[in-house]
Amino acid sequence: MPRERLLSHGAKSLSNTELLAILINTGRKGFSSIDISNELLKSASNLNELKKSSINDLIKVKGIGLQKAITLKAAFELGERMGRRAENNRIKITQPSDVADYMIPTMKDLTQEHFVILLLNSKNVVIKETCVFKGTLNSSIVHPREIFSIAVRENANAIIAVHNHPSGDVTPSQEDIITTMRLKECGLILGIDLLDHIIIGDNRFTSLVEAGYFDEND
């Protein structure tokens, strides 16, 4: 049964037919929800076309009444909105303030230090963000190997390090600087540049690039 499979193996283990069957919920005499799902899928050439179906289109499928059609249409619209939001959230980084604007809302009130890596593609668009460490930043704890293995796995062209200072003071500590230099050196070897290290506190930030720590002569 689809519901039991979802509980035991997760939603990703279900076929399109099974996922639709859960939304349809109940069948009709002689037809299970799986049977109705199959008929529903046959009514459109693909999922994208099915998503565009109107309420009237949906109720033409045997076993789909008005309430089921409304449930399906609501689910399709929700999926569409989530997809649009994910696309809109992919930001392009052109300057340190872009990183700050993106990360300050989620990091400024954290009571513990979080070390986050932004993974960028060749156009400097953020393709993923991942928190690699929580706690007091220590250069011996933040391993370049772990960070760059993530970057390689996600096919990132560059990374930006971001971490917060719960105290609100955005002055780089000696550990911040050491960690930055280690990541920068490893990035040069691997061909995945560390573009910046941003420190966030309250509604302020410090860019180690703007502070001069990335200068070639340092």
From Swiss-Prot:
Residues 92-214 form the MPN domain. Coiled coil: none annotated. Zn(2+) binds at residues 163, 165, 176. The keyword Protease applies. The keyword Ribonucleoprotein does not apply. GO terms for molecular function: metal ion binding; metallopeptidase activity. Keywords: Hydrolase, Metal-binding, Metalloprotease, Protease, Zinc. It comes from the Bacteria. PROSITE patterns: MPN, UPF0758. SUPFAM superfamilies: JAB1/MPN domain (SSF102712), RuvA domain 2-like (SSF47781). A motif (JAMM motif) lies at residues 163-176. GO terms for biological process: proteolysis. InterPro entries: MPN (IPR037518), RadC_JAB (IPR025657), RuvA_2-like (IPR010994), UPF0758 (IPR001405), UPF0758_CS (IPR020891), UPF0758_N (IPR046778). Belongs to the UPF0758 family. This is UPF0758 protein SAOUHSC_01763. It comes from Staphylococcus aureus (strain NCTC 8325 / PS 47). The lineage of its organism: Bacteria, Bacillati, Bacillota, Bacilli, Bacillales.
